[in-house]
C-alpha cells in the first residue's frame, strides 16, 4: 500500500490536475478531500481539454475509482452539469468509478446568493470571492446548519432539517442584506431534481477507502488551491474556507493520519494568483500581459485574468514546509522560453530589513520583492523528454529553484499535453 497527496504549494492554479492526470495511473483510487467548485483543475488529454471543478482528475483513467470525500462541499446543480459534460464527451461515469461521500456537505442556491451579497456589502474591501457559496457553506457547516449528501436519500428527514435551517438562513438574507427569502418548496424541488440524478453515487466512502486500503489498494488524494490559500496557514483572510493542506487529506477523506506517505507539491515555474490579497512579486502592465498571454493565465473557474509575476522563492519555500512536500513537480517551464532573462524573487524586504522567511499576515502586504535574474534559454522546449536534453540554462533554473526550496524536483512539465513532461 502506498498513498500520495497531490497539493498546491502557492496560491493555487499550479497545475495539480495536469499532474494528477499524469501520476494517477500509478494509483487505484483518486480522492478529492476539500473545497468545492470554486477552483478548477485543467486537464488536456486524448479526449480534449477539460476544466474540472469537483470531479477528481483520475476520471479519465480506466480502472481508477474517483471519490468526493466528506470534506468536499458540493453544489448539486454544478456537479451534475460537470458529470453530464464529461459523459457527453465520451467519459464513462458510473457508481463503480465515481463515488460521493454521504457526509459531504451540500452548497445550496442561497449560499451562492449570500456570497454575492456579502461581496457587494464589502465593496472595495471584498475578498475576491468566486461567488460559488464556499465561505457561507463552510461557515454554516461549523455552526451545524448544513445538509449532507446522504440526507438526500431520506426525503422526510431532509424536509424537516431543511425547514429549520432555511428559517434561520432567511433571517440573515432578509434582515442583514434586505434580499428576498428562499422558499422551502423551491429548495426541496432543487434537491429532488439534482439529488435524484446523484443518488446512485452516494455511499459510505469512508468504509470504501478503509476496505480498499485493507486490500492493498493505492490511494491518491487530490487537493484544491494551494498552501497560501489554506484557511489556517494562508494569507488570512484572503484564503479559501477549507484546508488545502496535505495533512487535511486524512480528515477530509476519512482515513488514519499516518497513511499518507508521499506528498507531491506542485509549483509553477512562475507565480500566479486569482483573487484579492498580498502578492509580493506581482508584475503589472505590458510585462504582466506578456507572461499572462504566454501562459494562458485565466482562471479555470472564473475566467478572470490571473495576477502574474516571477517565481517567489520565499512563498514557495514556505509552502513546501507547510505541505510537508517529499518531492516537487515544476509546471509550465516552457512558458518562460520567450524571456531573455528570467527574474526570480529570492527575498523580501520589510521595513528596510531583508528576510528569507515568509512573514505573518499583518506585515506581508508591506513586503517588497528582492530579485535576481537568470539567463533564459530562448528556444522551444516542448519536445524535450529527457533532462539532459534541456538547454543548460533551463536546467540551471530548475536546479536553482530546487536548492532554494530544499526539495527535490522530480517532474518538470514542458507543455500541457499528458506526455509533455520530464521525469528526473
Predicted regions and their residues:
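Non-transmembrane, aqueous-exposed alpha-helical and coiled segments at domain scale
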Residues: 1-424
Amino acid at each position: 500500500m502506498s498513498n500520495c497527496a497531490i497539493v498546491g504549494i502557492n496560491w493555487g492554479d499550479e497545475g495539480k490536475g495536469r499532474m494528477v492526470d499524469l501520476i494517477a495511473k500509478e494509483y487505484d483510487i483518486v480522492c478529492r478531500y476539500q473545497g468545492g467548485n470554486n477552483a478548477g483543475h485543467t486537464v488536456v488529454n486524448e479526449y480534449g481539454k477539460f476544466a474540472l471543478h469537483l470531479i477528481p482528475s483520475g476520471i479519465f483513467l480506466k480502472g481508477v475509482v474517483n471519490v468526493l470525500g466528506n470534506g468536499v462541499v458540493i453544489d448539486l446543480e454544478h456537479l451534475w452539469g460537470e458529470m453530464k459534460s464529461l459523459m457527453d464527451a465520451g467519459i464513462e461515469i458510473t457508481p463503480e468509478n465515481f463515488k460521493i461521500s454521504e457526509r459531504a456537505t451540500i452548497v445550496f442556491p442561497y449560499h451562492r446568493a449570500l456570497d454575492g451579497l456579502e461581496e457587494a456589502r464589502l465593496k472595495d474591501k471584498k475578498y475576491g470571492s468566486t461567488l460559488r457559496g464556499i465561505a457561507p457553506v463552510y461557515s454554516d457547516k461549523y455552526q451545524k446548519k448544513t445538509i449532507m449528501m446522504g440526507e438526500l436519500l431520506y426525503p422526510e428527514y431532509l424536509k424537516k432539517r431543511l425547514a429549520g435551517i432555511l428559517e434561520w438562513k432567511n433571517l440573515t438574507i432578509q434582515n442583514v442584506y434586505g434580499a428576498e427569502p428562499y422558499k422551502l418548496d423551491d429548495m426541496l424541488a432543487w434537491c429532488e431534481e439534482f439529488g435524484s440524478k446523484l443518488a446512485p453515487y452516494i455511499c459510505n466512502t469512508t468504509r470504501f477507502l478503509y476496505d480498499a486500503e485493507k486490500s492493498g489498494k493505492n490511494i491518491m488524494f487530490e487537493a484544491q488551491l494551494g498552501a497560501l490559500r489554506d484557511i489556517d496557514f494562508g494569507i488570512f483572510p484572503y484564503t479559501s474556507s477549507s484546508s488545502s493542506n496535505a495533512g487535511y487529506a486524512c480528515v477530509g477523506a476519512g482515513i488514519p493520519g499516518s497513511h499518507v506517505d508521499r506528498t507531491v507539491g506542485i509549483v509553477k515555474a512562475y507565480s500566479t494568483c486569482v483573487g484579492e490579497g498580498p502578492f509580493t512579486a506581482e508584475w503589472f502592465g505590458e510585462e504582466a500581459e506578456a507572461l499572462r498571454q504566454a501562459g494562458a493565465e485565466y482562471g479555470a473557474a472564473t475566467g478572470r485574468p490571473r495576477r502574474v509575476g516571477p517565481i517567489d522563492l520565499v512563498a514557495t519555500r514556505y509552502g513546501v514546509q507547510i505541505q510537508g512536500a517529499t518531492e516537487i513537480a515544476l509546471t509550465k517551464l516552457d512558458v518562460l522560453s520567450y524571456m531573455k532573462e528570467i527574474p526570480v524573487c529570492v527575498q523580501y524586504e520589510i521595513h528596510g530589513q531583508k528576510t528569507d522567511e515568509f512573514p505573518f499576515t499583518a506585515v506581508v502586504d508591506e513586503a517588497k520583492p528582492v530579485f535576481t535574474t537568470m539567463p533564459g534559454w530562448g528556444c522551444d522546449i516542448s519536445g524535450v523528454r529527457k533532462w539532459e536534453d534541456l538547454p543548460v540554462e533551463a536546467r540551471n533554473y530548475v536546479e536553482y529553484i530546487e536548492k532554494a526550496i530544499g526539495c527535490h524536483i522530480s517532474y518538470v512539465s514542458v507543455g500541457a499535453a499528458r506526455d509533455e513532461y520530464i521525469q528526473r
